[in-house]
Amino acid sequence: LLAEMGGRLRAYRAAAITPRLFILQQLPHAGWPLVWLLSLVNVALGLLPVIFVVATSVLIGRVPAAAAAGTGSAEWGALVSAFVVASAVFLAQQMLTPLQATLGELMQHRVNGYFHHRLMSVAMRSTGMAPLEDDTTQAAMQQASEMLQTAFRTPGHAASGMLAYIARYGRLLGLAVLVGVVGSWWWALLVLVATMAFRYGQRGATMRMWVRMWTALSAYRRERDYFRDLGLAGATGKEMRVFGLTGWVGERYRDSAVEALTPVWAQRRRYMLYHFLWYTAFALLADGLVLALMVRTAATGQLGLTGLAMGLQATIGAILLGEYYPEADANTQFGMGAVSALEDFDRRVAAYPEPAPAADPTVSAAGLPAHTIRFADVSFTYKGATRPVFDGLDLTLRAGERTAVVGLNGAGKSTLVKLLARLHEPDGGAVLVDGRDVREFPVDAWRRQLAVIFQDFNRYELSVTDNIAFGAIERTAEPAAVRSAAGKMSLLPALDALPRGFDTPLSRQYTDGADLSGGQWQRLAIARALYAVDAGARVLVLDEPTAALDIRAEAAFFDELAEVTRGATTLLISHRFSSVRRADRIVVLDRGRVIEDGTHESLLADGGRYAELFRLQAERFEADPYADLADDAHDEPGRERIW
């Protein structure tokens, strides 16, 4: 029995006490002057109702004598004095209540600002991508983000809610003292127990149940929200209507909403019966007993009119404090849930080891590679996967050479880029730069030598200049250099025609904003990489750079690219074999290993895997020359093809 009680106490401490103590520790983020001022306001709001009960009770007790003595008498003056005090206290409450709300809102913004900053810091803390590519970590991040962004359950609301309890529980203690003064102290104790039982039935276990349910059903809510957004988003409307999906999406939205709410309804019925009704019945019986004893005492003449009025008001006021506190209860409970979600996300990110810092953090990687980059006996497996991506990979990239890496999906092409950029670290072997392990350089120093554009490159809803200049964030954006990078990608006519030229935000959601076609976005992303090369990056990495282009546009594109990247160390990743024939050297990956290495002509002459796949793709194009043409840019208003 003792062990069971100890376990329950530990569980209660973990669920109710520890999170509240943590919330209190966050109050300094709001600033101590604000904390003390809001605390004093809450103390006043706790004491003033008690004083009001005393003043009105005295007022009631003086009515008979004042009525008998008449106006102008000392008794009438005492009655008026009690009325003035009660009125002043009432007015003070009315003035302090909006002040409490205003100061509480200010505290919420300040504390929430700290936690939003912390969420961003945790999400961006890792130098690699491993934590953010893990499904459970992603789910934890989405849960924390969702709970931090919802208006009524943020840590800031929890912080202001914790201070709001000062007013509520201060008033409860004051009213209990009044009950003890006019009656007996066991009456006061019974009133306190009854009120807290009422509180537990109204809020305690019930509110914790809501938080647990809310957290457990997060996946269902995300599915519901996905179908809602799918139905409301303009970008998805065309295809949904063409394929007749609108009715299906509406049904899925309703089904997912019902699926999310059904467990909530069941739990609500259970808690309403076993918690709310039983605890409420006990509280009403206990307070009814106190009220009956109070009236009986007054009937025997042992309690006067003032004492009876004070006792009745204090007892009824106390039981009313057993209700739900809108300014504190949900705010605190859900706010603690938001903090717990953020802590869970933090723990999951921290579970991934960071790369060991460079022995000399001041060492520079500028000018590297001068000779080679070598993947030396590299092995790598994604977390949770059973098959390694690389197992003994040995590949050398020569400085100043354009090397293309081709292979079927799953061959490890994109993973090669991630290892080169140190977004992941090899499980075995090493990436050597001019013979030195890349881990000898600080991560940021090495990445400044890389200009990488991934297949799923970022489309920043910012100006054209920002979208290009982000290639070298440490360099002040120079208009001439930005225009030069755009010009190398033949973008100047299209960009100059935008409403605000290079200052145009690339989103139609903004005033004078505009959007680009898929091919234009791809060229803009490569212009970002070329801007980085102009700023000093030595290695240009292009992962599927022509995914949004048709074959004819692709051929013209690579002719241009060959000119603007001449002399740079270039790594080109592609699944289209026709797009890499202009490379100085072609490497074929299969199952994480290099199986062929040579020029386009030599690999065709060898008749190996490259020749086989190249001819398969060539035969497809010869059979249907338009099979790979992409004409999406022609039908979008305001978009033009520029190649």
Where are these regions (language model features)?
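C-terminal portion of ABC ATPase nucleotide-binding domains
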Residues: D559, G567, R576, R581-W643
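An intracellular "coupling" helix at the cytosolic face of ABC transporter transmembrane type-1 domains
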Residues: H29, S145-A158, L232, R241-L285, ...
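Membrane-integrated ABC transporters
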Residues: L1-P49, S73, G77-S81, Q100, ...
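ABC-fold ATPase nucleotide-binding domain signature/coupling loops
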Residues: L492-L524, R528-P545, L549, D624-L629, ...
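Transmembrane helix-loop-helix hairpins at lipid-water interfaces of multipass membrane proteins
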Residues: W36-L99, Y169, L173-M207, L285-T306
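Conserved "ABC signature" C-loop
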Residues: F457-Y510, Y531-R538, R609-E612
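Extended non-transmembrane interhelical loops and adjacent amphipathic helices
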Residues: L1-L21, H109-G156, Y220-P263, M336-R347, ...
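Cytosolic ends of transmembrane helices, especially the final helix of ABC transmembrane type-1 domains
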Residues: G311-R348
